[in-house]
Amino acid sequence: MKIADIQVRTEHFPLTRPYRIAFRSIEEIDNLIVEIRTADGLLGLGAASPERHVTGETLEACHAALDHDRLGWLMGRDIRTLPRLCRELAERLPAAPAARAALDMALHDLVAQCLGLPLVEILGRAHDSLPTSVTIGIKPVEETLAEAREHLALGFRVLKVKLCGDEEQDFERLRRLHETLAGRAVVRVDPNQSYDRDGLLRLDRLVQELGIEFIEQPFPAGRTDWLRALPKAIRRRIAADESLLGPADAFALAAPPAACGIFNIKLMKCGGLAPARRIATIAETAGIDLMWGCMDESRISIAAALHAALACPATRYLDLDGSFDLARDVAEGGFILEDGRLRVTERPGLGLVYPD
């Protein structure tokens, strides 16, 4: 079960539905695809989608971290020593979380294939399936409502709405959306760090009035002090995203009084399944719910996140829609989307079907 070859390439993915969030617009993305082959013929897959605005990792830095010459230490290593390999990934690539994540998930894929089981079973399944949200970017009211109707028609019952920080615009969109949905879907909101303290208090009043599920990352990432100054009831409705990169952040956020009630884990922020599961353990111990999110990603890494999410008892929310709007992808399988719910396949490993 020794590693015989590692190949990395860049794939360009146009989006079928470009969108805007508080700090940028997104029309296309690049992912790095990782293939790790063992001497006995197994193929493990990983994908990296670095997000410079969140982690500081550029596509160029990610590519450099995955340069073939820098991965020589993995050649000949036994995949069954997975915990040690993941530990070494963190030591060798500390500033490249997306690169680490791609290698980490490919190694997990291989180990689960070696054992002949879906990865979620190796990790310890806690859920069979969960509903995922789909994201509506920042756009005019009528376009927001039209997109919401499209998602409802496709069976989705959880919508995440991006906010811009302009209260008049944000509140009008949310009120009109509430009227249009008429109880047919749950709404959660994501200001992407665009609110200040007074604005958040006004937003929270609207959240309670409209029955909105929670608020994701209202404040700038460094303002944990603003979060802790909020009443406990409001903090419980806050999900930390940009404030939560790795396990150290999770530990700090969970320290009493907990700064939030929900952790949004993303493999591209934390560096893969191994650190994600450490974050999950901290959350479960502290009584914090888990949300599993993503960047715009190939279904390879979405599948990896889903396997991890379904193996954590504290998982309450999924926001794993990152591959839905790709105009094309490099793999199939990995998960099944049905009536807005995600479940993994019964194939071993990540369950992906890949043209070899």
Swiss-Prot record:
One of its GO terms (molecular function) is magnesium ion binding. GO terms for biological process: amino acid catabolic process; peptide metabolic process. Disulfide bonds: none annotated. CDD domains: L-Ala-DL-Glu_epimerase. Its EC number is 5.1.1.-. Its cofactor is Mg(2+). It holds the Pfam family MR_MLE_C. PROSITE patterns: MR_MLE_2. It comes from the Bacteria. Mg(2+) binds at D190, E216, D241. Substrate binds at T135, K160, V161, K162, K266, D296, D319, L320, D321. Keywords: Isomerase, Magnesium, Metal-binding. Gene3D superfamilies: Enolase-like C-terminal domain, Enolase-like, N-terminal domain. Binds 1 Mg(2+) ion per subunit. InterPro entries: Dipeptide_epimerase, Enolase-like_C_sf, Enolase-like_N, Enolase_C-like, Mandel_Rmase/mucon_lact_enz_CS, Mandelate_racemase_C, Mandelate_racemase_N_dom. Catalyzes the epimerization of L-Lys-L-Arg to L-Lys-D-Arg. Can also catalyze the epimerization of other cationic dipeptides, such as L-Arg-L-Arg, L-Lys-L-Lys and L-Lys-L-His, but with lower efficiency (in vitro). Belongs to the mandelate racemase/muconate lactonizing enzyme family. Part of a large, functionally divergent protein family. Was initially predicted to have chloromuconate cycloisomerase activity, based on sequence similarity. Protein modeling and substrate docking was used to predict the substrate specificity, prior to biochemical analysis. PANTHER family: O-SUCCINYLBENZOATE SYNTHASE (PTHR48073:SF2), O-SUCCINYLBENZOATE SYNTHASE-RELATED (PTHR48073). This is L-Lys-D/L-Arg epimerase. It comes from Methylococcus capsulatus (strain ATCC 33009 / NCIMB 11132 / Bath).
